Amino acid sequence: MRRLALAAALVACTLGGCDQKEAARPPPPVAMTRDVIGHYCGMNLLEHPGPKGQIIVGSLIEPVWFSSARDTIAFTMLPDEPKDIQAIYVSDMGRATSWDKPGTDNWIEARKALFVIGSRLKGGMGSEEAVPFSDRAAAEKFASQHGGRIVSFAEVPRDYVLGAGDGTTADESAPRHGTTN
């Protein structure tokens, strides 16, 4: 009887571990369609150049869409936005056709992306952009052609994202996203 109880407990622990691993996997990104509207701008995303973003929030049925990667990052910093974020995806510009056609299904998890900040190219609403890449070589090539520096998601300065958006507040000594300076 004791062996049976031990075996049942072992099976339950094993199955429970599988469920935890499955639950920890983020939901996949959603392909961008003609119908998606930017969360902050209220405009159709396909009408704007540059990288886009989507955040999958546990308490919402549909992804929250953004006309720029910068706005996507801003959502994660703002205190009044939902915090039950399951996944953050941004356009992988290394796989984009062009700046004007960033793609509809070339997403990368934002927390794994590299971002070029301070480049000469502007995002979907004409503001400074945090240009995402999955590949360091692609990010370096972009930075050499358009200016800027490469940072991780956690290193994107709060004032770069939440400032005026014109590059005048991007201070390298400013606290970074994901740090407690």
What does each of the following model-derived ranges do?
Residues 23, 46:
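Short functional micro-motifs and their immediate structural scaffolds
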Residues 38:
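Short cysteine-rich clusters marking metal-coordination/redox-active sites
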Residues 42:
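Cys/His-coordinated zinc-binding microdomains
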Residues 62-102, 106-107:
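Mid-length scaffold segments of soluble, non-membrane domains
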Residues 134-181:
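C-terminal partner/receptor-binding element of secreted or periplasmic proteins
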